[in-house]
Amino acid sequence: MANHHDHDKPLRSALDPISSPYFSSLNGTLSIAKEVLIGPFQGDHRRSESARILSDLAPSLMQPRFLNAASSSQQSLSKSSHPGAPYPLLRLPTNLPFNKSSRPTASSLAILEAVDNLASLSLGDVSHPQNGQNSPSLIRGFKATIPSSELAKQRRRMVRGGIVDEDLGGKIGLKKLGDRARGLLTEKGEDEEDGELGVGRHAVKKRRKKRESRRFTEGRHLEGKLRLEDLAKQADEIGQDKENLHVRQSLIQSEIAEVGAKIDALEDIRRHLEASLLHLQEEDLELDDELEGVQELMASPAIKAAAGAKSLPLSSSGAGISNKSSRRRKGPAFLPSEHDELPSGVAFMTLNGHTAPITALDFDEPYGMLVTAGQDDVVKVWDLCDGEEIGQLRGHRGTVKALQVEDTLCLTGGADGNVRLWDLRMVEDYEERLHTQLAELARQDPLERIAEQRAHEEDGEHAEQDDELPDGTLQDPQPGDGSPCVRTLEGHSKSVTSLYYEDGCLVTGSSDKTIRQWDVATGQCVLTMDILWAISNPPPPPSSVPPQRPPRLSHRSSTSFGSNTYEDILPSPGASLVGMSGAALLGAATGQNFAVPTPPYADGTWEMYQDFVGGVQFWGYALASGSGDGGVRMWDMRTGQAHRTLIGHTAPVTCLQFDEQYIVTGSLDRTVRIWDLRMGSVSEVHKYEYPVTALQFDSRKVVACTGENGVEVYNRTTHAHSRLVVNGHTKPAEKMRFIDKYLVSGGRDGCAKVWAM
């Protein structure tokens, strides 16, 4: 075991045979270097895999022809840089001053300083870093998996089988027995089989004696048939086979880990591809909306007049689109180029002017004119380009709870039960005229003004005033006197809480529990629909009702927790959330004065909710309404009858919108429900922590005010939820309206926020 002793000797003693005869001769140096390099790998002790590889490869690489080729190649490469360096093949890496032309470097000096420490190290076995399991080398894995690695096992089995055959007196024909047991035909005849199987009486007695002999000896028949050297060799082979088995296990485990890593990588790739596919679906929907917007422009009279006699290709559904309400237009908004530079999800403009929560708002187009109404009984008109107030709409007595803006026409419904139509182009001039009148009144003697008022009263010329100027003087903005109010519609006996206008037709909902249809051109009410009559006379259920599955609970707000099933919210968010039972809610809905307490908002405030009709919208002859009893009714405007009632909300419905396939509703029961009009059932339920007060949707998203400071945005394609909060409201958002990527919201803090989505 001399080599084993050389394996553990210090590095200095191992380098001495190389450094001392370095200039003697090339052959002597090569032989000594070979002995030093290969000596540690020739011991009989167990060595690491890298040492085995070097031990296997070094004898082949150190042959004379390889050494001569390497020496000549190295000399040819180093002639230009080191012409005088002897034996460059074995030149030490420490840049020792064998070559006077080489200049010392910082690295070489550091190595020279550490020579004593490095030389004192022993030449131990090369150890692999432990990473849970040793990874076998390529050569070791090859040796463990080649077919020849199984030869030793087969040889041992053959040796043991030969001994047993000799002990049993020859083969006993087990293969034939197996074939016959399976019913297979053999090539030999029955006589030959009987002879081979030894069916004769003599053979049977002989095998019986052999079995008795083996039973009595208890395996001692192997003694003397295998030598110690053979047994030791078999033990070494078994150890080698076990090592090969461990190597194969390690290889399989490595492959399993690689397959797992590949599966994870593929899953990650799949997720990215699915996200890309969803993004493409959103782009497809956006292109559909853009195409419809282009077709709408092509159908407009101005474009047709400019085109002259040219016939433009229009779809069959393109006729009449130009007159539809802005709430159903799907085309892209014409936004300035600077809008794309705004960060998304940030409120970039704040409009302060109301001293109470905002109750309604609407605008005609992005960066156009905005109209807001608040509980301070003020209706303001804003310029969205610079955020300046243009003026006010004076005329309603009380709070305006519903309004809509279509181009330059604005319709407002107030607590006085009236609906007023305004021309927004006249607001600025009217404001200037009012300021002029105020200046004249300020210069007039107060006694003269009082005398004039008494004279008007005595003559009966003084009429009931509808608004009050800042100095306390009443001003009556009647149509035709230069006021922006162009028409007043009277008919409701209580507050107008919702309205919808399209193509000269207006539908209003009121707390008097009726829905009225108006002809705006004549100012006449053409149809009245009684909700109480619809409640007491519900439409008959359809003859065949398809089985309804529970709707999928798609979302809980950020503060929600618990079950994600529908059953856990079905009984709970009903009227109990507003402090009333179902019977009490029905009683409030059918009573004379409707009023229920709202659930607390995020800031802890609450109020009495008195808007019996929370939302209305029509399309053609189809009308949808949401009322205080939690019902969503579909009306036929030709007959004035409700032909379907969607039951699901368990608190008053505050807002709704519908298109060709879906109707989306929000309620005080803290849910937003998406109904499938074809099935007449709920397809999705989105539950929040606070009451839903406003919503709007298009083909890609649903935007809602859910009683929190932020505005909730639900992506209908990716089913992802986000919230607009940056530079947002300081109190819960109450109302909102968006067109394309431009959104305006109004909150209980009395301010309006303009967002880039």
Swiss-Prot record:
PROSITE patterns: WD_REPEATS_1, WD_REPEATS_2, WD_REPEATS_REGION. It holds the Pfam family WD40. WD repeats lie at residues 353-394, 396-432, 491-528, 602-645, 648-685, 687-724, 728-757. Residues 71-81, 312-324 have a biased composition (Low complexity). Signal peptide: none annotated. Its main location: mitochondrion. Residues 454-463 have a biased composition (Basic and acidic residues). Residues 69-88, 312-336, 454-489, 538-564 are annotated as: Disordered. Residues 225-300 form a coiled coil. It is found in: Mitochondrion outer membrane. Residues 538-550 have a biased composition (Pro residues). It is a peripheral membrane protein. InterPro entries: G-protein_beta_WD-40_rep, WD40/YVTN_repeat-like_dom_sf, WD40_repeat_CS, WD40_repeat_dom_sf, WD40_rpt. Transmembrane segments: none annotated. Keywords: Coiled coil, Membrane, Mitochondrion, Mitochondrion outer membrane, Repeat, WD repeat. One of its GO terms (cellular component) is mitochondrial outer membrane. It comes from the Eukaryota. Belongs to the WD repeat MDV1/CAF4 family. Involved in mitochondrial fission. Acts as an adapter protein required to form mitochondrial fission complexes. Formation of these complexes is required to promote constriction and fission of the mitochondrial compartment at a late step in mitochondrial division. This is Mitochondrial division protein 1.
